[in-house]
């Protein structure tokens, strides 16, 4: 049972505790930590996103679980946490992207889009009558010929990474990347490293049907999700 003095701060989003904490934001972060593992890796050719969709029942169709989304031709995101919250943010990101195209006749800059999403997420930590988003996003894209990878969290914090992970397996992913990440790796090397990180995060319980991969290329400036046979080929290479 919670101490009496703490319960009021738990219930109010906009009230700081005496030690400077917003408990509801911290609880939203816990929702992300319980989510499926997603990784993002920048490489010499672009950015790779890989997600373990965690199929919890053999009766479940893996294709019905979507954790990587295309936002615009040059941007994709991976999510961890509450799927419904992620879809809401994805829809908002798509609208912001189209508004930019209509207003300025050019694709939106990846960093600008990431900041707009984080500004929106931050407002849900500052006003009553709503709760923080219980999801985190990895935003990958190409702007001005440069690969970019950003991570958001429920507080509205925005950070840029060379390689990172979100979700339940984040500690194992970060350790793998810190030990083995190389900036000059190509798509193939980055994907193999990402699968290795997921393998560590899932304690060796990789299921090829639950792996989703998206890549955004510097050369073409386009984001795409890989087909099942492409994903299977990379997983098979890793397991050999």
From Swiss-Prot:
GO annotation, cellular component aspect: cytoplasm; proteasome core complex, alpha-subunit complex
InterPro entries hit by this protein: Ntn_hydrolases_N, Proteasome_alpha, Proteasome_alpha-type, Proteasome_asu_arc, Proteasome_asu_N, Proteasome_sua/b
Keyword Repeat (UniProt): no
Subcellular compartments: Cytoplasm
A biological-process GO annotation: proteasomal protein catabolic process
GO MF, one example: threonine-type endopeptidase activity
UniProt keyword terms in alphabetical order: Cytoplasm, Proteasome
Superkingdom, natural source: Archaea
Activity regulation note: The formation of the proteasomal ATPase PAN-20S proteasome complex, via the docking of the C-termini of PAN into the intersubunit pockets in the alpha-rings, triggers opening of the gate for substrate entry. Interconversion between the open-gate and close-gate conformations leads to a dynamic regulation of the 20S proteasome proteolysis activity.
Pfam (any one): Proteasome_A_N
Subunit-level organization: The 20S proteasome core is composed of 14 alpha and 14 beta subunits that assemble into four stacked heptameric rings, resulting in a barrel-shaped structure. The two inner rings, each composed of seven catalytic beta subunits, are sandwiched by two outer rings, each composed of seven alpha subunits. The catalytic chamber with the active sites is on the inside of the barrel. Has a gated structure, the ends of the cylinder being occluded by the N-termini of the alpha-subunits. Is capped at one or both ends by the proteasome regulatory ATPase, PAN.
Purpose of the protein: Component of the proteasome core, a large protease complex with broad specificity involved in protein degradation.
Family to which this protein belongs: Belongs to the peptidase T1A family.
Official protein name in the record: Proteasome subunit alpha
Organism for this UniProt entry: Methanoculleus marisnigri (strain ATCC 35101 / DSM 1498 / JR1)
